[in-house]
Amino acid sequence: MPLLHEQRGHVAILTLSRPEARNAWGEDYNDGLKELLPQLEEDRNVRVVILTGDDRGGAFSAGANIKDPKTHTSASIADAIEALPKRRRHQAFNLLTDFAKPVIAAVNGYAVGIGCIATYCCDLIVASEKAEWRLPQVGLGILPAQGGTVRLSRWVGRGIAMRVAMGFPLKAEEAYRAGLAQWLVPHDELMVKAMEVAEHVASLPPLATRLAKEAVNFGLDVPLREAANADLYRFMALELTEDKAESHQAWRERRKPQIKGR
């Protein structure tokens, strides 16, 4: 299975592994995400997910796997439009975006086309100095699907999103300065840093991290006052949790809290 799954404590690591084709994105990745993400969401032992590329491929993902026999083709434009919401890639990316727990992209090299879009379907990005984002679709006479331009503009603003949409690359240092990557590290330290970030997130009360993610994403889509009012309900829901009581007690006693996810 080209989408590899490894468990380290409370951290699940998903690796795009097609190194002979620079981890090109095929339907098997979509199928793997559709199979694994619901399982990981239900697994109480999993508190955070890392998505990365097999470093033997020299890339996070070099884009769509054009040799994949399952690649969607349609007899007509009408058929293609009708099929769009049902495409496995579209469904997989929605699952990734809507996944309740935090997802960290560890970008180890080129993230091109669909591989580029996958990184900012995640919540946090740790970038290697070798990372580079590219959207070549407009140069091929098409558009980035799966919300490729819309999602990017929400991360970095209109100007940089427009630049990337027009085919200009975004290198690691620029991505870090623009806020697309929250951490930029030497290449050989990428997974160490990604695990450090993941383990910190995993150490937090998981119900609180889930609602914090929900609050940030919800706030992008609604007026400020509506988002702020919704936060009050999330706050009150967390007031009733065991982890909230334990965290406050541990703070008073100057000790590490025993987080249970309840």
Regions found by a protein language model. Give the residues of each.
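C-terminal alpha-helix plus adjacent terminal tail
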Residues: 1-12, 44, 53-56, 168-173, ...
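Charged catalytic carboxylate motif
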Residues: 28-32, 88, 95, 193, ...
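Conserved CoA-thioester-binding segment of acyl-CoA-metabolizing enzymes
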Residues: 1-54
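Glycine- (often His-adjacent) and acidic-residue-rich active-site loop
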Residues: 53-95, 111, 141, 223
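Terminal peptide-recognition signature
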Residues: 14, 18, 33, 51, ...
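Crotonase-fold acyl-CoA enzyme core
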Residues: 95-209, 245-249
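Acidic-histidine catalytic/liganding microenvironments
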Residues: 43, 63, 99-100, 241
